[in-house]
């Protein structure tokens, strides 16, 4: 493991290394990316996104976390309905817990990619007590930080950034907040984002014409915005409770109801041409290893849930939440699919999601939506599709040593064949060796499935055995 600053050049260098190593080994690769920000055009057109996307075009698979700002209003947008119309953006000066922001960071982008200036933009200090705007001088804003306007050459969009030191701007007066006045002509429109930790958009009581803050269009820049990257959101796979190792008490870290999209999970849509998020996976209150060498690690942290001693060293586990917990679930699942079919492309993966992702009442039944993309990942159903997505000629290979896959459900075993087989002999035995069930299948095709029902068996321990020409698999089965 090596440290990383996650700067663009460094991420590109590491991706290049992994790509070249995989090519040298003659193997596919999948990269997990759990980082990002709200700074950027969110259209996948930055030079960095284009360079990373080239690896996807060459067959590399990138899996990226959407981000954890779904419960914040980091985005706003506006379309002007008449010429010389003015709209104001207001940025909160404190977090929900009352802690003041140290800085404000706003990134604003025209939707038109025509290389022209459409807006007149002026920063101001707004007094929430007397409802007055103070535009200040250029020298004042230079002391506060930086305000930059440009036409970005890589996407030809008008672009403004504001990076403001909060304490310099307001002098410690909590009544003073940062604002931006935007004037445009009919039909022009923009999107703007506050970077996480750099404020939220809102409308102060009694303030003049204000753009409404929301949580949409928040596909994380730097990873999830890469056009062919698989952007991952989080849903709640449990009820949010856990028992602490520290005091054996039950705690709740709920991110919403079980089965729903986690309230922290960033949502789309994406301003480029892709479905983002593309898929969601469990990411709320997930048990994982804790780094005891981290500066903020504490043995008294109630989120710790288990420890294991190996020699003289103690290893700790605890619960964490975030799309960075959901993303490795997807990355690992795709790695499993690549074992079954190393030729899968990023587009193949998307098609598998489209065909197999689960939809339910908690997240809706439409083909896609801005919160969960195609739906909840189904590793097993996706594996079946991955096996079926084989190149012409594979179907002529019989009796491979590719292992079968077994999925245990409440009252049955589902057996998935990873290769063509001339036959399969399936039998279930008691621990004393008495055969209680048997099946025989011929001319099995890659991706075929057999189901063994256990519903008629008495409670106890059984052994299931599957024989093919080149492979024999045995598993214990507990029937309750």
Predicted regions and their residues:
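Hydrolase catalytic cores
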Residues: 1-8, 12, 16-24, 105-113, ...
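Substrate-binding/specificity loop regions of serine endopeptidase catalytic domains
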Residues: 37-60, 64-260, 288-323
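Short proline/glycine-enriched turn/loop motifs at strand-loop junctions of beta-rich domains
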Residues: 112-116, 283, 419-423
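Extracellular/periplasmic catalytic domains that process cell-envelope and extracellular macromolecules
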Residues: 23-25, 55-57, 222-227, 270-274, ...
């Amino acid at each position: 493991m090596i440290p990383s600053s996650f700067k663009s050049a460094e991420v590109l260098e590491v991706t290049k290394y992994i790509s070249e190593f995989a090519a040298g080994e003659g193997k596919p690769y999948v990269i997990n990316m759990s980082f990002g920000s709200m700074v950027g055009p969110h259209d996948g057109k930055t030079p960095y996104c284009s360079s990373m996307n080239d690896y996807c075009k060459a067959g590399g698979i990138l899996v990226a976390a959407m981000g954890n700002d779904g419960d914040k209003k980091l985005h706003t947008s506006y379309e002007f309905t008449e010429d010389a119309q003015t709209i104001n953006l207001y940025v909160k000066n404190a977090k929900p817990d009352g802690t003041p922001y140290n800085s404000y960071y706003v990134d604003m982008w025209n939707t038109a990619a025509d290389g022209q200036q459409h807006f007149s933009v002026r920063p101001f200090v707004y007094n929430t007590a007397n409802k007055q705007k103070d535009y200040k001088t250029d020298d004042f804003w230079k002391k506060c930080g930086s305000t930059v306007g440009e036409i970005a050459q890589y996407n030809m969009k008008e672009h403004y950034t504001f990076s403001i030191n909060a304490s310099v701007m307001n002098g410690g007066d909590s009544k003073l907040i940062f604002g931006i006045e935007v004037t445009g002509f009919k039909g022009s429109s923009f999107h703007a984002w506050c970077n996480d930790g750099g404020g939220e958009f809102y409308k102060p009581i009694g303030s003049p014409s204000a753009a409404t803050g929301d949580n949409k269009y928040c596909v994380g820049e730097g990873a999830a915005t890469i056009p062919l990257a698989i952007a991952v959101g989080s849903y709640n796979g449990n009820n949010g409770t856990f028992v602490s190792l520290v005091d054996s008490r039950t705690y709740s870290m709920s991110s919403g109801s079980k089965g729903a999209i986690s309230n922290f999970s960033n949502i789309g849509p994406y301003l480029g041409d892709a479905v983002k998020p593309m898929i969601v996976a469990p990411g709320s209150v997930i048990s994982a290893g804790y780094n005891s060498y981290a500066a903020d690690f504490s043995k008294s942290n109630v989120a710790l849930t288990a420890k294991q001693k190996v020699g003289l060293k103690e290893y700790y586990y605890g619960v964490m939440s975030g799309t960075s917990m959901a993303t490795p679930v997807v990355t690992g699942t795709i790695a499993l699919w690549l074992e079954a079919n190393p030729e899968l492309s990023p587009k193949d993966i998307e098609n598998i999601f489209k065909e197999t992702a689960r939809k339910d009442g908690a997240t809706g039944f439409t083909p896609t939506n801005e919160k969960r993309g195609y739906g909840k990942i189904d590793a097993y159903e996706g594996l079946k599709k991955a096996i079926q997505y084989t190149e012409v000629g594979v179907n002529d290979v019989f009796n491979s040593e590719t292992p079968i896959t077994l999925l245990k459900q409440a009252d049955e075993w589902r057996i998935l064949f990873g290769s063509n087989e001339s036959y399969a002999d399936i039998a279930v035995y008691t621990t004393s060796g008495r055969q209680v069930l048997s099946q025989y299948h011929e001319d099995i095709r890659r991706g075929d499935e057999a189901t063994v029902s256990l519903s008629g068996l008495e409670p106890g321990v059984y052994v299931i055995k599957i024989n093919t020409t080149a492979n024999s698999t045995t598993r214990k089965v507990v029937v309750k």
